[in-house]
UniProtKB/Swiss-Prot annotation:
Organism ancestry: Bacteria, Pseudomonadati, Pseudomonadota, Alphaproteobacteria, Rhodobacterales
Gene of this entry: infA
InterPro entries, per the entry: NA-bd_OB-fold, RNA-binding_domain_S1_IF1, S1_domain, TIF_IF1
GO cellular component term, pick one: cytosol
Subunit details: Component of the 30S ribosomal translation pre-initiation complex which assembles on the 30S ribosome in the order IF-2 and IF-3, IF-1 and N-formylmethionyl-tRNA(fMet); mRNA recruitment can occur at any time during PIC assembly.
Transmembrane spans: none
Protein task: One of the essential components for the initiation of protein synthesis. Stabilizes the binding of IF-2 and IF-3 on the 30S subunit to which N-formylmethionyl-tRNA(fMet) subsequently binds. Helps modulate mRNA selection, yielding the 30S pre-initiation complex (PIC). Upon addition of the 50S ribosomal subunit IF-1, IF-2 and IF-3 are released leaving the mature 70S translation initiation complex.
S1-like domain: residues covered: 1-72
One MF annotation (Gene Ontology) recorded for this entry: rRNA binding
Subcellular location: Cytoplasm
Name of the protein in its database record: Translation initiation factor IF-1
Keywords: Cytoplasm, Initiation factor, Protein biosynthesis, RNA-binding, rRNA-binding
Amino acid sequence: MAKEELLEFPGVVKELLPNATFRVELENGHEIIAHTAGKMRKNRIRVLAGDKVQVEMTPYDLTKGRINYRFK
């Protein structure tokens, strides 16, 4: 089965939620719930409120996403 195309959007972390999840406001104004990617957890990259991040989402559920990069 082919890997589905992921949608990538820049956004800003608005709120930290329990269980290592975050409320992220995307550039287009939508708010989603996102968790950190495994490589970010492994390398202990911290994400705080106000950080600019890159979020990838699947086209099947546009309310959830994965944070795969934190901009410096």
